Amino acid sequence: MRRYIIILLAVAMNNVAFSQKDANYNKIKRSYTVNSDGTIDYNYRKELKVISLRSFFSVYGETFIVYNPEFQKLKINESYTIRKDGSKVQTPANAFVEQLPSTCTNCQRYNGIREMVVVHTALEYDATIVLDYTITSTTADFSEVIDWVENAPVDSYEVSVTLPQGKKLYYDMQNSTAKPTVKGNTYTWNMKKLKQSAAEYYAPSQRELYPVLYLSTKSMSDEVPMDSQLNEYNSLINSLKVAGDKMKTAVAIRNYVANYINHNNIPLALVNNKVSTSVQTLSSGCGTTMDKAVLVRDMLIEAGFEASLNIPTTIRKSPNGDFATSDESNVMVSVVIDGKTYDMSPISTAEPVQCLKEKRISHFSNSTLELADTNIRVQTQIQVSNTKAKDVETLKLNVLDAENEYYSFGIPQCGINILPEYLTSKRSTPVVCGKTNESYSFNILLPENVKYIGQPVDIKYEKPFGSIEIKIFQKEDTLVVVRKLTINDEQISVKDYKAFRQMMIDWKNPNYTNIIFKYAK
């Protein structure tokens, strides 16, 4: 009995530990002051209470502040720890360490960017980290995106923007009805008791789930001009051309940039929103996502293609007028080939995607699977409509137990790729799955000495978001496998999550996706 009590206590304590939060922000404050002399002061303050051992050893023990001394100055205003007994411990001078950010390596142009690492000291259970710093930037325009969510709960979150006389602030709050308090030229937003971000697989982006505030003093964005000096690299561009094949030529140009120009994944704001010319990017062999996109575009144009940048841009409504926000980190290069427009990533060798087209697969085949001195014939019919559909894999037999002559035949799956093991029993966010319409039919002709090992399967049901059908049965010497799946929605709501999870468990069940045979000599 004593042993069972100890086990139960251990389980109970373990559950408490996992349900407890690691840390809690007592306060976060962001203040932006746009000065008339062309500088912007950004002040950040956080007061973070660390609760678990993991919080101060693995998660919150250091703060990383990235800035560019070329146009920014960093000043640490306060940095100390309030211990559980109320005593204050100042962060020592040797706990401030400057280093080159990992995203700036292998590019001499960005070697001046710095990352200040603040190592928080005197951490213990229920200690509070206090950090206050200011970054002063010399820049033309103010633009910022505030995500009102952290990896720990926040008791109080304040954002304020102060402008010089006559300057307009464009702003748009999404996923919240919070409005600013305006006093003179200062706009202030306050939020209380914010939940921490959810860490769940297949979840929508944070900006779909949590409040996000877009701020700008500029109404619209400008197009990045083409580099007229790129003709210096005509020999390189000509060497990448594939005679008689425009698609292969376009892909070869993109692949050159993706493979041989180092990608420095840093935000444009860190380089004062400056995009390098294509000659600068080529000659240095490195660049940001936007730099590489501009280079791909310009090389395609120089090679005779019609090409442009496809930057996700949203026109937003503000009390002071419309303004545009862009997501340069997800920029694509659009190229026209034989009258069709394709999007290409400038940082990877992913297959070009035809714009606004859903990938469809129609596959019909008669295959023969060789098994010792016996052949198994398979008639296959597959129809898949899915934006991320994969090509049909070659059918093959897998040896399960060679000694006892057991073999398996894996059913190809080309469409939805949601793994049930990542779907927890409870969920707080929608599931991003994408629409799909899949139909698979296999007629497997079994010789006399090959037996199907398994039970008949007959699953068929329908839910508001989609339907499923799985049938496995033997009709004389033919084993029939039918699989159909339809998902009508891009996302599955929390309300429908339980039913969707069960549907994915059924769809991916290895008993229904692997057909096992026994070969009798």
Residue positions per predicted region:
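Sec/Tat signal peptide C-region and signal peptidase I cleavage site
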Residues: 13-19
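Sec-dependent N-terminal signal peptides
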Residues: 4-13
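A sensor for short, sequence-defined functional sites
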Residues: 20-521
